[in-house]
C-alpha cells in the first residue's frame, strides 16, 4: 500500500511544480504586455462629456378615442362598485331628517344644519364653475419660440446649444472636455454647472453614458496627435431653472425629438436619436 501512495504523492508534487512554472511564465508575459501598452495620455483622440438635458412633460397628452372610451368604462365600474363616502352618508341622513320634518316628526334643533351638506355641494359647484383649465397651447407655441421652456407642455424637450467649430456654427448637445482626475459623468455635471450661470438643477440618470459619438476635426485643425474627439452622452432630467438668455439669445433651443433634425448634422442626429425618448 505504501508504494502506490508514494507514487501518487510524487505525481501530485510534480504536477504542482509544472503548474507553478506555467503560472510564473503567464504572469511574466502579462506584465510585458501591460508594459508595452501605450499610455492613454498619448491618444490622438480627445474625450468629451456631453449633457442630454431633458425637460419631461408637465401635462398629460390628450386621450385618444380608444383611451377615452376605456377611461369612461373604468369610471362607470368604479361608481357602480364603490361604497358611499362620508359626505354621501351625511347627505342621505339629512334627507331622512328632511322627510321627518315634512311629517312633523323632527326636532327644532335639527333645523340649523339640515341643509348643511347641500350648502357644501352648492359652494363646491360654484368653485368648480370658476375654475379654468390652463391652456395647452402657450404663447411660445403660437410664436414658435423654441428658446422658451414653456412650450410643447405634453412633450419631452431636449436642450441644444450652438457652438463654433472652426469657421462653422454647429448645433450640438452641451459638452465639455474631460479633465484628468474627474469621471466622464463629472465632466457632464461640470457642463451643467456652466450653463445658465449655475441656476439649473437636474437629476442625472446613472453613472454610465447612454451613448457615444466619434468625429474628426476639420482638416485645418487636424494633426497626427489631434485627430478628433470621442463624445460620451449622459442623460439628466431638468428639475428647476432655465437657460439664461443673457448674452446667449439665439444660442440655445428646447426641441422635441421630431425637431432635432432641424438642427443636428445627420450622423450626429443618428446617434442622439438612439437614446432620446419621446414620452
Curated annotation (Swiss-Prot):
CDD domains: NUDIX_MRP_L46. GO terms for molecular function: structural constituent of ribosome. It comes from the Eukaryota. Keywords: Acetylation, Mitochondrion, Ribonucleoprotein, Ribosomal protein, Transit peptide. The modification N6-acetyllysine is found at residue 230. One of its GO terms (biological process) is mitochondrial translation. One of its GO terms (cellular component) is nucleoplasm. It is found in: Mitochondrion. PANTHER family: 39S RIBOSOMAL PROTEIN L46, MITOCHONDRIAL PRECURSOR-RELATED, LARGE RIBOSOMAL SUBUNIT PROTEIN ML46. Belongs to the mitochondrion-specific ribosomal protein mL46 family. Component of the mitochondrial large ribosomal subunit (mt-LSU). Mature mammalian 55S mitochondrial ribosomes consist of a small (28S) and a large (39S) subunit. The 28S small subunit contains a 12S ribosomal RNA (12S mt-rRNA) and 30 different proteins. The 39S large subunit contains a 16S rRNA (16S mt-rRNA), a copy of mitochondrial valine transfer RNA (mt-tRNA(Val)), which plays an integral structural role, and 52 different proteins. mL46 is located at the central protuberance. This is Large ribosomal subunit protein mL46. It comes from Homo sapiens (Human). The gene is MRPL46.
Amino acid at each position: 500500500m505504501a508504494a502506490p501512495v508514494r507514487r501518487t504523492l510524487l505525481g501530485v508534487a510534480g504536477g504542482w511544480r509544472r503548474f507553478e512554472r506555467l503560472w510564473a511564465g503567464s504572469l511574466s508575459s502579462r506584465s510585458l504586455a501591460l508594459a508595452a501598452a501605450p499610455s492613454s495620455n498619448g491618444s490622438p483622440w480627445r474625450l468629451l462629456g456631453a449633457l442630454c438635458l431633458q425637460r419631461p412633460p408637465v401635462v398629460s397628452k390628450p386621450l385618444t378615442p380608444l383611451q377615452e372610451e376605456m377611461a369612461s368604462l373604468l369610471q362607470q365600474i368604479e361608481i357602480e362598485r364603490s361604497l358611499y363616502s362620508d359626505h354621501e352618508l351625511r347627505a342621505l341622513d339629512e334627507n331622512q331628517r328632511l322627510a321627518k320634518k315634512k311629517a312633523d316628526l323632527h326636532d327644532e334643533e335639527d333645523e340649523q344644519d339640515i341643509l348643511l351638506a347641500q350648502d357644501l355641494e352648492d359652494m363646491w359647484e360654484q368653485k368648480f364653475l370658476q375654475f379654468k383649465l390652463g391652456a395647452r397651447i402657450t404663447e411660445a407655441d403660437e410664436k414658435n419660440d423654441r428658446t422658451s421652456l414653456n412650450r410643447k407642455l405634453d412633450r419631452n424637450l431636449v436642450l441644444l446649444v450652438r457652438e463654433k467649430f472652426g469657421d462653422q456654427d454647429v448645433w450640438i448637445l452641451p459638452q465639455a472636455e474631460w479633465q484628468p482626475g474627474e469621471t466622464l459623468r463629472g465632466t457632464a455635471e461640470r457642463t451643467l454647472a456652466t450653463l445658465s450661470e449655475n441656476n439649473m438643477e437636474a437629476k442625472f440618470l446613472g453613472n454610465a453614458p447612454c451613448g457615444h459619438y466619434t468625429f474628426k476635426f476639420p482638416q485645418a485643425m487636424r494633426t497626427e496627435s489631434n485627430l478628433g474627439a470621442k463624445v460620451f452622452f449622459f442623460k439628466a432630467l431638468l428639475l428647476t431653472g432655465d437657460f439664461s438668455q443673457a448674452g446667449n439669445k439665439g444660442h440655445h433651443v428646447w426641441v422635441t425629438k421630431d425637431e432635432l433634425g432641424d438642427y443636428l448634422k445627420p450622423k450626429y442626429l443618428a446617434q442622439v436619436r438612439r437614446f432620446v425618448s419621446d414620452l
